[in-house]
From Swiss-Prot:
This is DNA-directed RNA polymerase subunit beta'. One of its GO terms (biological process) is DNA-templated transcription. Residues 1392-1412 are annotated as: Disordered. DNA-dependent RNA polymerase catalyzes the transcription of DNA into RNA using the four ribonucleoside triphosphates as substrates. Binds 1 Mg(2+) ion per subunit. Binds 2 Zn(2+) ions per subunit. The gene is rpoC.
Length: 1412
């Protein structure tokens, strides 16, 4: 028996729970929480400061004010614990119970809870099936509602005005009952039979056909079923008892001068109590109905204000006219309970100070000011002082520390040793924003930071501050040391590139040391070793940049891998190099060849160097190497003594002439404009074009002049070498500045933009060296100011995007090693406009192969499915010319409630397969959100330079190889023997000798092909040409032209060209046609053969009809003979409006929010043949006949550009009307893989434009979360409702159960939710409530009696548990296993004892109950 008791004791100690349930409280429940009724509105006595009895702060209800002391002072001290004083009625206990004890107010008349009334959709309205307006009229005493119609013709829930009511009473007497106010609504709620209603609704759902009704019923059914399942009674939405918050949570603090500061809640409660007491009195006095009614209405309004002030009517205001802060306001928003106190706590043992550079530190160290350390490590010092016997008590120890005796400093040194601290720089945009360092005590008051970690923190030393936190427990120290130490975080989690890359001075120093000069001092000397070079250099016999020959010893990996053999062996070889490079070779880590250093080290090169070191030599060697590179860089930069002066800015000699020519051209355009030859817009575009070209030309001339300098070589010949100009070196090395900036210093500043983004056509021809005049300076300020305003906006927007991303992915954690799926996506190199934008190797690096990778030549398997493709693997794949690899992806992972390691692949921040427990969702969100501030905010208006560049009229090959056409390419040969493309989506590829795709080009409709399939070509060969300014309509059949509905003045108009004098027919807009009849006709062409019969489409009975669009210029005449491939009409493309491209941050947000673009393109719903039906007003009708012969119609606005023509075969999901794609359509018609490809590519386009690298897998992780809900199509035997959206994992679990029980599973379709919507629709109500729309989320959850299983990270942070990620995941797993074994042990003991005493055994109840 004792064992049993022990176990119970154990359980009671700490509250362990696995879930939290939320529900509506019944009146009895509220009374059971309460410690007494609050009857008076008084708070505290202003003279004695003692709480009034029965008031809002009453000590009898809520507990004593001082620990273990009753109010009147009769009982004091611990010995009376638990006694209730007979004089003042206060229980003697701890004062902190005033934080947890609740009271209640018995309401004289029931009151509706405003959340369930006004939070849309109104829950009360749904349950009662009445409109919100009607319920409000009843609740606020403006109308009666029929409760029981009796034998009268009235209907239940009918609304009637007061006048009506009295008439009906006269007519029917007391045959019927009607009420007003919350009592009436409560009666109605009580009269509802939920089970019956649910049955009726289910049958109605099955039988009804109307969409609107189905939606309405499904919504109501969902709410009613929630009540049914959760056991919550609907009439609890009407309050009879109001709980009162514990007084410590709504404090009243006396200020000096006899005034009080109080929480707004006290005011609100006071109003409720006052009105409630007044109502009680009125009821006792049997006051007239109208007065009572008014008082009841006021009580309802007072309670509304207390719960959610301002939701209905005007907000209640305090004395200072500002709205009072109600209970709802306490929890929602940035300053509410969730975001302010639960997710954003302040941390003890922390400090902050300014940072300064600490170039002498090692990478894992930081300099901590002594005074700061003393304060932060106080408890550790106290402990040490006691242990050492220096101080006897904590008080004495405190004195020692305050006096800062010498022994304290010694102890501080000891305490701090090997105790890492965490440094954080706000804003913490990704996980490298907090790193751990070993502190080194320093004098002064600023924290010293290692220069190489600045990139990760995005810190600089212009006054940035950082915060220090001390991990206290041993576990925390261990985690800080192993997981967060700066030297263990050398790669960016976003893209796997090294984060400890040198920048600025270091780069400049290394670059200067590794440059080579012609005819430097000591050129051509040979040295036997590096030490000899150093000696020569120190004696000024050679210069750093002189070319010399040196014997260099490299440590290479030993081929012999047997036991005891050394890992590296020396290898000596003679290199032609420079003095600087030879000197640098001393710091190369073993395993790297000298060739990696034997080139000028620019920033990119250094980054590549560190990356190579990491992959080849491991983490430790890399960290040491980076540190040494930094030391050398600083030293060499100092030795170099590079500085810049005005003379370094060389203004090109040709500048005047270039600018003069441009001005002449501009004058010429002005003249043309004046004489009316060009429009104002054309003139503006041309002027802007000329100036941007000029500015480029000046820049080019300047760079040519800057980048080389004349020099005499050893043989006395004059040659040119790369320049040693300081400004040029800074930009070229990547240390600071860019070609654009140099162009502004020494070339010309060029065109400036107005704040609205349009370009000012007057350029700034001066540069900073020559100086700007007043007008030029003014134009400059215009753009600069806009830049600053933009930056401020951008930061806020970017932060909000990150917050939404984190919220949608926060519960995605790697929970298992392998889900065993064989699905994946096919990865190809990303090609755009013929350029390889991203090579295949970059896209598959660090992924797991989904199917075997096979050598195309020998057909042998190189890598089996399930292999992690590392650097060597991708190099093999690239070498063998494999151009497509199927890899696992987060999108197809079959793990429920998480991801598996194989589908995710490599953890980019560590360089190895991701660990179980890694919070990959948050990392993905951070990786996408962190560079958000670098993206632009603006929408690009295509105009001027941009649009001119976009007009291409031919496509040429960039590499040698063989031309291949895709399957969609169709072309015909015309009379001249030219091949004319008649497909809309044809592409030409160039493949190399082993069949690998090298480039791919879209070839537009109507282009002339110059090379055919299979042709061998050289780089630079033209593949196709076309007219960029018009879009042709081409016939695929020959014959005689027969016009239909082509009537001058009705459907077409004659246009006479001013210049040539020729007339052409142009199709006019429907809106401009005169008569009603002519609006529906469509001008078109039929073809007649030699016998005068209409030419039919081969294999069908349809005649060939070729329709003309609005604006088409008809180039053939009626009755003219045409050949195959001839042009019938041309549509000028100038008429296409230039679309604004949404760029930057707004575009990323738009994609992740899955917004349907306005004027979206239309995709074909089915595979079939197109034809045009009868046009309606302003719309044209496109019909697709599928293979079964069913017709699908699309109505398309006339101004839209239809991409298909009559009788064309289209595939499902192909675009048929031009416009931006709608992601929802892509998902529906092309599936998940196509959708993910679309979103990934579009997001990457935005980031690539800014030069930001993000790995695809992060975007895929977000897309997975956007797809995490499915819509039920047919519910089978499951508990779901058709049309309901449910979590995919729940759906699959439920289906598994159905299949196991032999019932019908549900069918579903994927739906795409934007990130905000996805966050709000998560299963965890705690997470959703802390994100946005707190009220709505909590209302819904309470009605459903939702249970939060605490799966995600956010919920666990809020309830204060370890998060189920990283070490926390292991902790929770272990805890659950232990609980399981405890339970088994418990059952076993119970069984044994039952056996002993002969009583029947009962299995133990589970000790966990969801916490209410």
């Amino acid at each position: 028996m004792k064992a049993l008791l022990d176990l119970f004791k154990q359980v009671q100690q700490e509250e362990i729970f696995d879930a939290i349930k939320i529900g509506l409280a019944s009146p009895d429940k509220i009374r059971s929480w309460s410690f007494g009724e609050v009857k008076k509105p008084e708070t505290i006595n202003y003279r004695t400061f003692k709480p009034e009895r029965d008031g809002l702060f009453c000590a009898k209800i809520f507990g004593p004010i001082k620990d273990y002391e009753c109010l009147c002072g009769k009982y004091k001290r611990l010995k009376h614990r638990g006694v209730i004083c007979e004089k003042c009625g206060v229980e003697v206990t701890l004062a902190k119970v005033r934080r947890e004890r609740m009271g209640h107010i018995e309401l004289a008349s029931p009151v509706a809870h405003i959340w369930f009334l006004k939070s849309l959709p109104s829950r009360l309205g749904m349950v009662l099936d009445m409109t919100l307006r009607d319920i409000e009229r009843v609740l606020y005493f403006e109308a009666y509602v029929v409760i029981d119609p009796g034998m009268t013709p009235l209907k239940a829930r009918q609304i009637m005005t007061e006048e009506d009511y009295y008439n009906k009473v006269e007519e029917y007497g007391d045959e019927f009952r009607a009420e007003m106010g919350a009592e009436g609504v409560r009666e109605l709620l009580r009269s509802i039979n939920i089970d019956e209603q649910v049955e009726t609704l289910r049958t109605e759902l099955k039988n009804t056909g109307s969409e609107a009704k189905i939606k309405k019923y499904a919504k109501r059914l969902k709410v009613l079923e929630a009540f049914q399942r959760s056991g919550i009674k609907p009439d609890w939405m009407i309050l009879e008892v109001l709980p009162v918050l514990p007084p410590e949570l709504r404090p009243l603090v006396p200020l000096d001068g006899g005034r009080f500061a109080t929480s707004d809640l006290n005011d609100l409660y006071r109003r409720v109590i006052n009105r409630n007491n007044r109502l009680k009195r009125l009821l006792e006095l049997k006051a007239p109905e109208i007065i009572v009614r008014n008082e009841k209405r006021m009580l309802q309004e007072a309670v509304d204000s207390l719960l959610d002030n301002g939701r209905r009517g005007k907000a209640m205001t305090g004395a200072n006219k500002r709205p009072l802060k109600s209970l709802a306001d306490m929890i929602k928003g940035k300053g509410g309970r969730f975001r302010q106190n639960l997710l954003g706590k302040r941390v003890d043992y922390s400090g902050r100070s300014v940072i300064v550079v600490g170039p002498t530190l090692k990478l894992h160290q930081c300099g901590l000011p002594k005074l700061m350390a003393l304060e932060l490590f106080k408890p550790f010092i106290f402990n040490k002082l006691e242990v050492m016997g220096v101080a006897t008590t904590i008080k004495a120890a405190k004195k020692e520390v305050e006096n800062q005796t010498p022994v304290v400093w010694d102890i501080l040194e000891e305490v701090i040793r090997e105790h890492p601290v965490m440094l954080n720089r706000a804003p913490t945009l990704h996980r490298l924003g907090i790193q751990a360092f070993e502190p080194v005590l320093i004098e002064g008051k600023a924290i010293q930071l290692h220069p190489l970690v600045c990139a990760a923190f995005n810190a600089d030393f212009d006054g940035d501050q950082m915060a220090v936190h001390v991990p206290l427990s041993l576990e925390a120290q261990m985690e800080a040391r192993t997981l967060m130490l700066a030297s263990n975080n050398v790669l960016f989690p976003a893209n796997g590139d090294p984060s400890i890359v040198p920048s600025q001075d270091i780069v400049l120093g290394l670059y200067y040391a590794t440059r080579e000069a012609i005819n430097g001092k000591g050129e051509g000397l040979s040295f036997t070793g590096v030490s000899e070079v150093i000696r020569a250099y120190e004696n000024k016999e050679v210069e750093l940049a002189s070319r010399v020959n040196v014997r260099i010893t490299e440590m290479v990996r030993n081929e012999d891998t047997s036991e005891g053999a050394p890992q590296f062996v020396p290898k000596i070889s003679l290199y032609a190099t420079t003095v600087g490079r030879a000197i640098l070779s001393e710091i190369l880590p073993p395993g790297l060849p000298f060739s990696v250093l034997n080139k000028p080290l620019k920033k990119k090169e250094i980054s590549r160097l560190i990356n190579t070191a990491f992959r080849k030599c491991g983490l430790r060697a890399t960290v040491v190497f980076a540190d040494q590179l930094m030391q050398s860089g600083f030293r060499l930069a100092t030795r170099a003594g590079i500085s810049i002066c005005v003379d370094d800015m060389l203004v090109p000699t040709q500048k005047e002439q270039i600018v003069g020519d441009a001005a002449k051209k501009v004058k010429e355009y002005d003249r043309q404009y004046m004489s009316g030859l060009v429009t104002a817009q054309e003139r503006y575009n041309n002027v802007v074009d000329i100036w941007s070209a000029t500015s480029e030309a000046v820049g080019k001339a300047m760079m040519e002049q800057l980048s080389t300098e004349p020099v005499v070589d050893r043989d006395g010949n004059e040659t040119r070498q790369e320049s040693f100009n300081s400004i040029y070196m800074m930009a070229d090395s990547g240390a600071r500045g860019s070609a654009v900036q140099i162009r502004q210093l020494a070339g010309m500043r060029g065109l400036m933009a107005k704040p609205d983004g349009s370009i000012i056509e007057t350029p700034i021809t001066a540069n900073f060296r020559e100086g700007l005049n007043v007008l030029q300076y003014f134009i400059s300020t215009h753009g600069a100011r806009k830049g600053l305003a933009d930056t401020a906006l951008k930061t806020a927007n970017s932060g909000y995007l990150t917050r939404r991303l984190v919220d949608v992915t926060q519960d995605l954690v790697v929970v298992e090693d392998d889900c065993g799926t064989s699905n994946g996506v096919a990865m190809k190199a990303l090609v755009e406009g013929g350029e390889v934008v991203e090579a295949l190797r970059d896209r598959i690096l660090g992924r797991v192969a989904a199917s075997d990778v096979v050598n195309p030549e020998t057909q042998e398997t190189l890598y089996e499915a399930g292999t992690l493709l590392d650097e060597t693997a991708v190099e093999d794949i690239e070498r063998l010319g494999i151009d497509e690899v199927r890899v696992r992806t987060a999108l197809t992972c079959e793990t429920r409630y998480g991801l598996c390691a194989s589908c995710y692949g490599r953890d980019l921040g560590r360089g190895s397969l991701v660990n179980v427990g890694e919070a990959v969702g948050v990392i993905a969100a951070q990786s996408i959100g962190e560079p958000g501030t670098q993206l632009t905010m603006r929408t690009f208006h295509i105009g001027g330079a941009a649009s001119r560049a976009a007009v291409a009229s031919s496509v040429e090959a960039k590499s040698n190889g063989t031309v291949r056409f895709t399957a969609t390419m169709r072309y015909v040969t015309n009379a001249k023997g030219e091949q004319i493309v008649i497909s809309r989506s044809g592409e030409a590829m160039i493949t190399d000798d082993i069949g690998r795709e090298r480039e791919r080009h879209k070839v537009p409709y109507g282009a002339t092909l110059l090379q055919l399939d299979g042709a061998q070509i050289k780089a630079g060969t033209q593949l196709a040409t076309w007219d960029p300014l018009t879009r042709p309509i081409i016939t695929e059949y020959g014959g005689t032209v027969k016009f239909e509905n082509v009537e001058e003045g009705v459907t077409v108009a004659k246009q006479i060209d001013d210049v040539t004098g020729l007339s052409t027919l142009v199709v006019i807009d429907v809106k401009r046609r005169g008569s009603q009849a002519s609006k529906s006709v469509r001008p078109q062409v039929k073809l007649l053969d030699a016998n005068g019969e209409e030419v039919k489409i081969p294999g069908t009975e349809h005649a060939v009809q070729i329709g003309f669009q609005v604006g088409a210029l008809i180039t053939v005449k009626d009755g003219q003979q045409v050949q195959v491939g001839e042009v019938l009409a041309r549509i000028p493309t100038e008429a296409q409006k230039t679309r604004d491209i949404t760029g930057g941050l707004p575009r990323v947000a738009e994609l992740f929010e899955a917004r349907s673009p306005k004027d979206a393109g239309i995709l074909a719903e089915v595979t079939g043949t197109t034809s045009f039906g009868k046009d309606t007003k302003g719309k044209q009708r496109l019909v697709i006949t599928d293979l079964e012969g069913n017709q699908h119609e699309f109505l398309i606005a006339k101004e839209k550009q239809v991409l298909v023509h009559d009788a064309q075969v289209v595939n499902k999901g192909e675009m048929i009307v031009d416009g931006p794609a709608d992601p929802h359509d892509i998902l529906r018609l092309q599936g998940i893989e196509a959708l993910s490809r679309y979103i990934v590519d579009e997001v990457q386009d935005v980031y690539r434009l800014q030069g930001v690298k993000i790995n695809d897998k992060h975007i895929e992780v977000i897309v997975r979360q956007m797809l995490r809900r499915v819509q039920i199509v047919d519910n089978g035997d499951t508990r779901f409702i058709p049309g309901e959206q449910v979590e995919r994992s729940d759906m699959l679990d439920e289906n598994d159960r159905m299949i196991a029980e032999g019932k019908r599973p549900a069918t579903y379709e994927n739906i795409l939710l934007g990130i905000t919507k996805a966050s709000l629709s998560t299963d965890s109500f705690i997470s959703a409530a802390s994100f946005q729309e707190t009220t709505r989320v909590l209302t819904e959850a309470a009605i459903m009696g939702k249970r939060d299983d605490l799966r995600g990270l956010k919920e666990n942070v809020i309830v204060g548990r370890l998060i189920p990620a990283g070490t926390g995941l292991a902790f929770h797993k272990a805890r659950k296993a232990k609980e399981q074994s405890d339970r088994e042990r418990f059952d076993q003991i119970a069984a044994e004892e039952a056996f002993e005493f002969g009583t029947p055994s009962t299995p133990a109840e589970e000790p966990q109950h969801p916490a209410e």
